[in-house]
């Protein structure tokens, strides 16, 4: 795991006088937003077997993370469909009283999910989920930190630079970093889906030593 604090030194030159703790807070927030938008932090959970009569299960995920979205779930080799709480109660009003072969799932919380109908036996469940850090986490998966370092830094900078009435406030630069962050998140989303990237890369973050106002006008719109 990589700590958010390890990235602080890469942000400080662009936000003079900003406390380390505030930088770390916004690095965490940027990482969460990136994971939500891109769904790039994917975990294939270890398969597990259902228990007869039990419909609620915990996601088996790393400490300091929570499930943003279930990407795939199968029961006994058959794909299951997601369902909303309202649809569950409307379409299966007595589901708690019946057992059978589960064919829908409901993400109840960031750490738990239901499968319906209530399992009548022990069958294998396989799930793939998109994760994100919790609001209290201090670390992020090293692969995500390394592969999407630019995105995380862009995201933290656009958040910090828009804070009003600070020595480092720069609304124009904030907007530019927000633009770059969106491009990185879109690229990561397409890559996670296995699709054609189709997004032209423009200016890349190059680390410490760049002047704060490093972009001119972007000119042409990016084609997605």
Predicted regions, residues:
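Glycine-enriched, solvent-exposed interface loops adjoining structured elements
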Residues: 1-224
């Amino acid at each position: 795991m990589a700590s958010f604090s390890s990235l602080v030194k890469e942000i400080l030159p662009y936000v003079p006088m900003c406390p380390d703790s505030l930088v770390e807070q916004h690095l965490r927030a940027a990482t969460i937003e990136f994971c939500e938008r891109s769904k790039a932090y994917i975990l294939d959970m270890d398969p597990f077997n259902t228990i007869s009569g039990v419909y609620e299960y915990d996601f088996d995920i790393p400490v300091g993370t929570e499930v943003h979205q279930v990407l795939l779930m199968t029961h006994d080799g058959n794909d299951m469909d997601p369902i909303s709480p309202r649809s569950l109660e409307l379409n299966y009003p007595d589901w708690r009283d019946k057992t059978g072969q589960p064919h829908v799932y409901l993400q109840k919380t960031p750490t738990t999910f239901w499968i319906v109908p209530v399992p009548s036996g022990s069958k294998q469940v396989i799930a793939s989920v998109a994760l994100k850090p919790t609001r209290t986490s201090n670390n992020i998966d090293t692969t995500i930190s390394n592969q999407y370092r630019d995105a995380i830094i862009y995201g933290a900078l656009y958040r910090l630079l828009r804070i009003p009435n600070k020595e480092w406030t720069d609304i124009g630069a904030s907007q530019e970093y927000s633009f770059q962050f969106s491009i990185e998140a879109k690229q990561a989303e397409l890559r996670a889906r296995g699709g054609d990237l189709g997004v032209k890369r423009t200016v890349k973050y190059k680390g410490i030593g760049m002047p704060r106002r490093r972009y001119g006008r972007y000119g042409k719109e990016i084609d997605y």
